[in-house]
């Protein structure tokens, strides 16, 4: 945990206007050079039962600059020590939220399905947390569930009680005012890593981009051997 590290990550709600890199200007001089922490390679070590090992070796830093020209992005990138740079033109991909480019393999890569073809993303995630003594920090979560906010997937959580639970919840019980466009609504709330179980009595209402309403609850965090990374859930269409 490091106070102030939240300043170097994108807005965790998924609000596209809250990226760390400023909006790309048509005026070249207004586009800054950014130092990019490349994070880690995907971990390959086998973790202890109930633990995770998602991060491998650190990948170091690069410097990047993004320009725009004729509706395309011009990505300039280089190692920190070099005085020259590589440059590639990246076109927007119709029907997709993003076009992804790997600075390691130096090519466009497929990461997500088409924008309207998915609702939930099971992933590692960088959240922003409040520190006990004040200030904020960036923090990495495993077993995180994000919603597709750019396709306006909405959700809210419900704590079951004696009168309302997952089994008897119906379309008439949906509170449309409670539906939110924030990719953290499910987040890490659905599971308890200390007990290796799902959060009891919690279920979710989800509305997809077509207006379909579902109820969903998680049934497992680990597999039969106690290994994380095997979430299970059930869901039902309400309308």
Describe each model-derived feature in a short phrase.
Residues 1-239:
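Surface-exposed, beta-sheet-biased, low-hydrophobicity segments with strongly acidic/polar composition
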């Amino acid at each position: 945990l490091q106070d102030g590290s939240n300043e170097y990550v994108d807005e965790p709600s998924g609000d596209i206007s809250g990226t760390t890199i400023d909006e790309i200007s048509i005026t070249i001089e207004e586009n800054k050079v950014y130092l990019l922490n490349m994070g880690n390679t995907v971990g390959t070590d086998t973790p202890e039962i109930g633990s995770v090992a998602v991060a491998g070796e650190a990948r170091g830093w690069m410097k990047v600059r993004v320009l725009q020209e004729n509706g395309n992005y011009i990505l300039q990138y280089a190692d920190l020590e070099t005085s020259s740079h590589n440059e590639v033109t990246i076109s927007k991909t119709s029907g997709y939220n993003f076009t992804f480019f790997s600075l390691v393999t130096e090519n466009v890569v497929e990461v997500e399905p088409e924008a309207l073809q998915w609702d939930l993303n099971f992933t590692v995630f960088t959240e922003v947390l409040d520190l006990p003594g004040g200030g904020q920090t960036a923090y990495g979560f495993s077993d995180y569930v994000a919603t597709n906010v750019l396709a306006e997937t909405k959700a809210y959580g419900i704590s079951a009680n004696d009168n309302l639970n997952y089994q008897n919840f119906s379309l008439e019980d949906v509170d449309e005012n409670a539906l939110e466009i924030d990719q953290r609504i499910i987040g890490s709330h659905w599971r308890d890593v200390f007990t290796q179980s799902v959060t009891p009595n919690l279920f979710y209402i989800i509305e997809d981009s077509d207006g379909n309403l579902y109820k969903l609850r998680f049934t497992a965090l680990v597999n039969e051997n106690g290994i994380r990374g095997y979430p299970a859930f059930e869901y039902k269409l309400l309308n």
